[in-house]
């Protein structure tokens, strides 16, 4: 077994353990049973839930200012949003074809200005739909079709070192931050800036990890202060 596979499995195991610890904290805090059993995995945003409170939680732990919130292929993304023709070409150029690595993608200055503007306009016109996919419910290939997943209601930033909650917000709180903001395009990334000038998300080409994940669309979320 390769060291990459082994470390990936360990990370998943550690993550599940931390979700269990947070579930206990939330149960003690609210007096209502929270659990991470029967949820999680690569096709859901839900890490912890409480049926009695109708709370469906995504747990985030970040050592820095941001952490991954969504990872998907351009194929799944474009299929979900029914993107084709010139706009589809931009996605193939900016992120590169699957498994082509950094050498297979183009940067903003290497792409036609009209295509870049087409893409930026699309992200801003569809900013709430983009938010729903990357934060609220995801988009996953199931039974041969790309469908949205089950929606979360809350996001919690959890400090794995101290086993304490840093911040808990509702998805609607995050959605309201998005409504007044906009996407901007840089040479190799897109950034989302809210109405107060704070960076909330960025989108980059995944360049690390196994070849099968390279050239994927990797979204990061910034911790709410």
Residue ranges and their predicted role:
Residues 1-45, 49-52, 59-225:
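Nucleic-acid endonuclease domains
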